[in-house]
């Protein structure tokens, strides 16, 4: 496909994504407060919310998709900002499963697998460390949601000002068509709301998958050729910026971090060069939720999207910028890779335990 045509397709897919977010919001509003309360009763506990964020992201293999859904839920009033913030933190952890799974593809070659698994799990350990430190602070003092709310009010006006979405009118008509479609099938009330939610979710997932695929075709091949040359000469700050820019370009932190795995496995990219790129990917991936917030009708949805960005920026400033904390994920990932090389089955157990079993237990106990 010609480059110009593919770029136009990406723009159309982003529009489709916004339609999906608005459909999700409209469906939840139709379902009503009682249904919403039952639907989200399992996430009233912040730790349960964290676990739901992990599981939801693992399920759809995209933190962009899961945080966009969370933004839609907040916009509809089904979820409060306090409930949503732990969820987006969980999404940060859940998204790292992709590059960890990619690293398992090198399992037959010990030296390659050791380097690949370390490069993958350094992202896991940083995100877990960030959540372990910042979630308790957020629950007590609320600095993340406070900063996000302050920025949100600067952008849309002080409290009490009606939030007028700049893209709402662009997606209003297609959402109306979806409502009319389900009306023709005789759906009403909660059934219609559930169908709108399901339709919106399908649209969001399909649109994001196609955006990712086409953006990768546009830019990722060039990125893979030049990334190591850039990072080999640059310090952590430039690597961080590369992670942000690449992730915004391809609309997927998983692609950015997964590109690093074969480079690390081959020994052409060091763990310390790969590490800051993954942190930049954390920040870059939040652009999707910010975009979703533009299609929502509530200032709280923008607050949650900004909270995701704020959390990642604070995590980098407070952990990566400090030499002691910066080394913790590197040391942990290196040690985990040593263990995984000696007992490869433990690598598989780690993936299931970290991303599925532990979150499921958390939800089951704390709901």
Can you say where each PLM-predicted feature lies in the sequence?
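Alpha-helical transmembrane segments of integral membrane proteins
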Residues: 3-13, 86, 118, 194-201, ...
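Alpha-helical transmembrane segments in multi-pass membrane proteins
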Residues: 13, 17, 21, 45, ...
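Hydrophobic alpha-helical segments of integral membrane proteins
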Residues: 24-39, 43, 70, 143-159, ...
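Long, highly hydrophobic alpha-helical transmembrane signal-anchor segments
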Residues: 53, 57-60, 68, 168-193, ...
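Juxtamembrane and boundary regions of transmembrane helices in multi-pass small-molecule transporters
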Residues: 18, 101-169, 202-209, 213-214, ...
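Membrane-interfacial helix-loop connectors
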Residues: 57-92, 104-107, 153-164, 246-313
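Membrane-interface segments at loop-to-transmembrane junctions
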Residues: 39-44, 113-125, 225-238, 267-268, ...
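Helix-loop-helix hairpins and the membrane-proximal interhelical loops
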Residues: 1-50, 178-240
């Amino acid at each position: 496909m010609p480059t110009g045509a593919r770029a136009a397709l990406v723009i159309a897919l982003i529009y489709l994504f916004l339609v999906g977010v608005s459909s999700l919001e409209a469906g939840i509003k139709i379902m009503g407060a009682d249904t919403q309360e039952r639907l989200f009763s399992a996430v009233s506990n912040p730790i349960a919310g964290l676990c739901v964020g992990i599981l939801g992201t693992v399920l759809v293999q995209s933190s962009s998709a899961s945080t966009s859904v969370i933004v839609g839920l907040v916009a509809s009033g089904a979820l409060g900002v306090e409930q949503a913030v732990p969820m987006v933190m969980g999404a940060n952890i859940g998204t790292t499963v992709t590059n960890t799974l990619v690293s398992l593809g090198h399992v037959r070659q010990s030296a390659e697998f050791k380097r690949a698994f370390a490069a993958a799990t350094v992202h896991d350990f940083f995100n877990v460390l960030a959540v372990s430190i910042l979630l308790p602070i957020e629950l007590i003092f609320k600095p993340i949601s406070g900063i996000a709310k302050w920025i949100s009010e600067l952008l849309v006006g002080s409290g009490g000002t009606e939030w007028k979405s700049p893209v709402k009118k662009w997606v209003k008509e297609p959402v109306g068509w979806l409502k009319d479609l389900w009306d023709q099938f005789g759906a009403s009330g909660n059934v219609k709301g559930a169908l709108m939610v399901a339709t919106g979710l399908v649209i969001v997932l399909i649109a994001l998958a196609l955006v990712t695929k086409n953006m990768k075709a546009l830019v990722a091949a060039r990125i893979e050729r030049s990334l190591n040359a850039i990072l080999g000469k640059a310090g952590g700050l430039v690597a961080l910026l590369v992670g942000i820019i690449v992730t915004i370009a391809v609309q997927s932190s998983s692609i950015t971090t997964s590109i690093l795995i074969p480079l690390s496995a081959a020994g052409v990219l060091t763990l310390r060069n790969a590490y800051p790129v993954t942190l930049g990917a954390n920040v870059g991936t939040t652009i999707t939720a910010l975009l979703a917030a533009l299609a929502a009708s509530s200032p709280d949805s923008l607050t949650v999207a900004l909270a995701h960005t704020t959390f990642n920026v604070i995590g980098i400033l407070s952990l990566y910028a400090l030499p002691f904390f910066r080394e913790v994920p590197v040391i942990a990932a290196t040690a985990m890779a040593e263990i995984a090389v000696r007992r490869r089955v433990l690598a598989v157990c780690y993936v299931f335990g970290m991303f599925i079993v532990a979150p499921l237990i958390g939800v089951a106990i704390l709901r």
